[in-house]
Structures are given as C-alpha cells and as structure tokens.
A protein has these predicted regions:
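Conserved helix-loop-beta element of the AMP-binding
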Residues: 48, 115-134
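Glycine-rich helix-loop-beta junction characteristic of Rossmann-like nucleotide cofactor-binding loops
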Residues: 38-43, 67, 118-120
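Conserved AMP-binding/adenylate-forming
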Residues: 134-187
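Conserved S/T- and glycine-rich ATP-binding loop of Class I adenylate-forming
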Residues: 10-13, 49, 98, 127, ...
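Nucleotide 5′-phosphate-binding alpha/beta core
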Residues: 1-9, 14-32, 36-40, 44-46
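Adenylate-forming
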Residues: 104-123, 140-145
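Short, structured coil segments at secondary-structure junctions
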Residues: 71-72, 93, 123, 145-149
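AMP-binding/adenylate-forming
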Residues: 23-37, 48-107
Length: 187
C-alpha cells in the first residue's frame, strides 16, 4: 500500500464493491487518457466542462475532473444531484461540455423543460456519457432534448475508471479502446 495514493471502489450494484488502489502513475495515466477522450469528443482547452458525475469513491467525478484539467479545460465540479442547481450553474457558467450519466442528463433536460428553457438557449454542445448502459434511442432523446452531440465513454473501476475507451465525435459509432494503454481479451 505504500505506493497507493488513492482508493476508489465500484458501485457494488451486484454485490460488495470492488476496492482498487491507484498509484500516482495510475492517476497520471488516467488523467491523460480522459484528456485524450475529451479531445476525441471534440473538447478543446478553451472549453468549460460541467462535471455532474458523483465525486467520491466512484471513479466518474474525479476521473472527469482531472482529465479535463489535464486537457486545459475549465472545470465546474458540480457532482451529482441538486438538479435545480445543475441547471442554474449551466445557465450561469455556460459550459460547452457536460460529463454525466445518460439517465441523469435526461433528468437535467426535464428541469430545463420545466423552466421553459429551450435547447437552443443552452450553452452545451457536447455531452460525454458513461457509468451505465445506454443505447441509440436514449442518445437520440438526449441529443434532441439538450441540443447536443452525445458521446459514449467507457471505463471501470477495476481498470482505470472512465477513459478506457471513448467515441469520436465525427462518427459516434461506438467507443474505441485506447490500445496503447489497454489490451482487451475476449474470453
């Protein structure tokens, strides 16, 4: 444990959470691959990123946060919940990118609708969604309700959190594994 600088854990949805220790090299590599994923999703150093993944033992919030900083972006570390405040922060800070679960993005979209805020009035251009399964139907709904490009990012606590694979904004045809860091094995 002397090289471990951070502990993360899986959600434990199907049992006891899997706890994983990360070294400083793991954290640095992770920040680099999330930054690369942001660029693949169309992000640039000029962008503001609204991080609405939860912070804590779950890898989503901190992975998105440090990757966005590594990419040179301005981070709005909102975390999860507080939907009314999420919408207010988006309207106030005008981020171009949101990183959140796809299901919670629809909750945020419902709040925009409740406030009669139309997609064209929202600053968001891209959403990077992960941490749960979603399909093309949900992608279409998110894109329509928020007026954004919806991009899939993949990760898992046991390997490195979000950023193991990510879609490219030009094609949106499924996440690509960063094969210079990961070797998938299909059993």
């Amino acid at each position: 444990m002397e090289q471990v600088v951070r502990i993360h854990a899986s959600s434990g949805t199907t049992g006891k959470p899997t706890v994983v220790g990360y070294t400083q090299n793991d954290i640095d590599t992770w920040a680099n691959i999330v930054a690369r994923s942001l660029r693949a999703a169309g992000g640039t150093a000029k962008d503001k990123i609204h991080v609405a993944y939860g912070y804590g033992l779950f890898t989503g919030g901190l992975g998105a946060h440090y990757g966005a900083e590594r990419a040179g972006c301005t981070v709005i570390p909102m975390s999860g919940g507080q939907t009314e405040k999420q919408v207010q922060q988006i309207m106030d800070f005008k981020p171009e990118i949101i990183m959140v679960t796809p299901s919670y993005s629809l909750v945020i979209a419902e709040e925009f609708e409740r406030l009669n805020i139309k997609p064209e009035e929202i600053s968001l251009k891209v959403g990077i969604f992960g941490a749960e399964p979603w399909g093309e139907g949900m992608r279409s709904e998110i894109e329509r309700k928020l007026g954004i490009d919806a991009i899939d990012i993949y990760g898992l606590t046991e390997v490195m959190g979000p950023g193991v694979a990510c879609e490219c904004i030009e094609t949106k045809d499924g996440p690509v594994i960063w094969e210079d860091h990961f070797y998938p094995e299909i059993i």
